[in-house]
Amino acid sequence: QRNLPQEPEQTEERRLTVERNVPLDSLFMAYHMCSHDHPDYYAFDILSDLLSNGRSSRLNQHLVQQKQLFSSIDAYISGSVDAGLFHISGKPSAGVSLEQAEAAVREELERLQQEPVDEQELEKVKNKFESTQIFGNINYLNVATNLAWFELLGRAEDMEKEVDRYRAVTAGQLQRVAQSAFRQENGVILYYKKQVS
């Protein structure tokens, strides 16, 4: 068991704009979330899949295909024994400002806070996760890596319960974690801009 001090709770939004010699502007957003051993971890993981895993995911469908505000966008979580982050990163389409891009992402996050996820949409994400887990366990390296991870957490016997934990996530839980995490004061925003010469 590690005994490291926890980062103090963030009480106001953090923002940074950086200009570099890069080909395209990029938007990076991050929100503090729980550690892997917290029950809400599974809800955050499902939220990230709901937002960006596959062509029918919300961010891809709404912001890339329909509104064409982004050329690419991704949502993912990072977290282990310590508290993690919910990340959203994307490259706005030509002519779209980083401010417009951020506003569009915030709109999608607010939707998650205000409206429960449709049961059919939630079931689809859970099924995709379950099939990934099952097919992943065909590979011995994946099984060994997962077993090592759960042993690090001190609960190797729980590895077999992982799918059940994802299956147990409800639309109400998704809405609750979205409301708690996607608050402005809990966010870190980075505008990574193309340097104008």
What residue spans do the PLM features occupy?
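A common structural junction motif
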Residues: 67, 106-116
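C-terminal catalytic subdomain
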Residues: 101-104
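Short beta-alpha connecting loops at secondary-structure transitions
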Residues: 89-90, 113, 158-162
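Scaffold signal of the M16-like zinc-metallopeptidase fold and its non-catalytic homologs
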Residues: 76-81, 108, 135-165
